[in-house]
């Protein structure tokens, strides 16, 4: 996911929530 947050914004947001 890292480096592809633009293509996986939904997934990226989930990871940010985890942090």
Curated annotation (Swiss-Prot):
Single GO term (MF): serine-type peptidase activity
Temperature dependence: Optimum temperature is between 20 and 40 degrees Celsius.
PTM text: N-glycosylated.
GO-annotated cellular components: extracellular region
pH dependence: Optimum pH is 8.
Cystine residue pairs: none
Tissue expression profile of the protein: Expressed by the venom gland.
Protease as UniProt keyword: yes
EC number: 3.4.21.-
Keywords: Blood coagulation cascade activating toxin, Glycoprotein, Hemostasis impairing toxin, Hydrolase, Protease, Secreted, Serine protease, Toxin
Activity regulation, short description: Its proteolytic activity is inhibited by PMSF and TPCK.
GO biological process assignments: proteolysis
Domain Peptidase S1 residues, every copy: 1-19
Localization per record: Secreted
Protein family: Belongs to the peptidase S1 family. Snake venom subfamily.
Subunit structure, interactors included: Monomer.
Function: Thrombin-like snake venom serine protease that cleaves alpha-chain of fibrinogen (FGA) releasing fibrinopeptide A. Has high clotting activity.
Protein name, UniProt field: Thrombin-like enzyme calobin-2
Natural source organism: Gloydius ussuriensis (Ussuri mamushi)
């Amino acid at each position: 996911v890292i480096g592809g947050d633009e293509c996986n914004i939904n997934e990226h947001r989930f990871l940010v929530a985890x942090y």
